[in-house]
Amino acid sequence: MRRREFIAALGGAASAWPHAAQGQATPKTHVVLWVSTEAQPDPFIASFREGMRERGYVEGQNLAFVLRYAPGDPARLREALPELLGVPADFIVSSGPAILAMRAATGKPVLFAVSGDPVALGIAESLARPGRNFTGTTFMSLDVAQKRVQLLKELLPGMSKLAILSQKNHPGEQSEHEATRAAADALSISLAYIPFAAGPELDGALQRVAEAGANAMLVFPDGVTMVHRAKIADFALSRRLP
């Protein structure tokens, strides 16, 4: 599914919550707290606004946004948690590492999109029956983690060592690591596992990748690596590292 279609779908899910204003002469303004570790301008919010508009929720008429950003730094959101929880929002929209801070928002509906495991993150009891006050979707697929290794091997038949760059606090990261290792073992590929915890540690992690002597690099996707994707791509190009 294309990103625009997906976020429009999220808008539809969000619109199912606020029914209190129906039948009122003066429409209620529904307040959305948008919490993100994306860099500004946020690539997702324009599509979300459009999806909400298509369902009758128009910013400036019956919809308002409160925007809070901490690009690549979820710790800043955790520090700002008292302020965030004090925002008089009808529901919260969040994604990626920002969800870690939103776990404390137990009194409001939270709409999420994550690349990790919602169960490991602690925001869902199971994928089939999430429970709690969170709803959304995950892009995580352990089958895809294995396919990435297989694809690299097809592109580089002589590959014997693969560097794994991973933001270690990403929920579900351990499962993704295990699935990748199993695929690598099946193809007789050794792994150089290089974890880091946050954006400020990325330079050191990339230096360890350079020193690993790997034939290729695999980056586990999450909000932090997405924010720093240009730096990671420039590094790979400079090292001629697939």
Could you say what each language-model-derived stretch is?
Residues M1-P242:
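Short hydrophobic alpha-helices and adjacent helix-cap/hinge residues
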